[in-house]
Amino acid sequence: EVISKVLYPEDKHYEGKMLRLKQHYFFTSATLQYAIKNFKKHFGNNFDLLPDKCVFHINDTHPGLAIPELIRLLIDQEGLSWEMAQRITYRCMAYTNHTVMAEALERWPVDMMKQTLPRIYMILEELNRRMCAELFKSYPDQWERIGHMAIIGYGQVHMANLCVAMSFSVNGVSQLHGKILQDSLFHDYWLLNNCLLYTSPSPRDTERS
């Protein structure tokens, strides 16, 4: 009851942060479990069809835990391989970024994630290991750059990096915002073509054109 009583409580102290993390997980997991249950009613266990029937909009990073949670559900409950679960999850996720300030991007302390969501952290570690191995092929020995792009680094889980790396579509909230994401905040991902980064025209953009 405490988890769902007050949405987004005060999080300037450790207990508040942990409660917020639990809320993020609670709501994303409930949503995904409902979606999978409904999908199976219509299409059985043919999860190759899931990306054609379900796209989950990660509107800012708050629901970003949907990424490791969907992988967990597909592996632990549905018996899929890691490779298939990761591929399906990538094709199901679309991320909208709302800030261009790196310091405002959501991060979670590794210790808190390990303590609160140990299985989710295991999945994040494996995603990070695989992603960094791929990044090393493009940026050999550029450890600072790879660390900047990593999902886990410097004692924190970087939710924006997770969302960019594991979403088939990434967009900003306006054309200018999207351009800034391409040119600065997510520039290294953009160079790799690791994500489909595009811009969403706002009503003002449309009026000017």
What are these regions, as identified by a protein language model?
Residues E1, S167-F168, V173-L196:
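Catalytic nucleotidyl-transfer cores of nucleotide-processing enzymes
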Residues E1-V55:
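Function-dense linear segments that define catalytic or interfacial modules
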Residues S29-Q33, E69-E78:
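Alpha-helical support elements that line or immediately flank enzyme active sites
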Residues N38-P51, L74-R87, T99, E134, ...:
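Secondary-structure transition/capping motifs at alpha-helix termini
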Residues H57-E69, C92-T96:
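Core structural elements
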Residues Q77-E125, R129:
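Extended, well-ordered alpha-helical scaffold/bundle regions in very large, multi-domain proteins
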Residues E125-G155:
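Polar, glycine-rich mid-to-C-terminal structural blocks
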Residues Y198-D205:
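Conserved small/polar residues in nucleotide/adenosyl-binding loops
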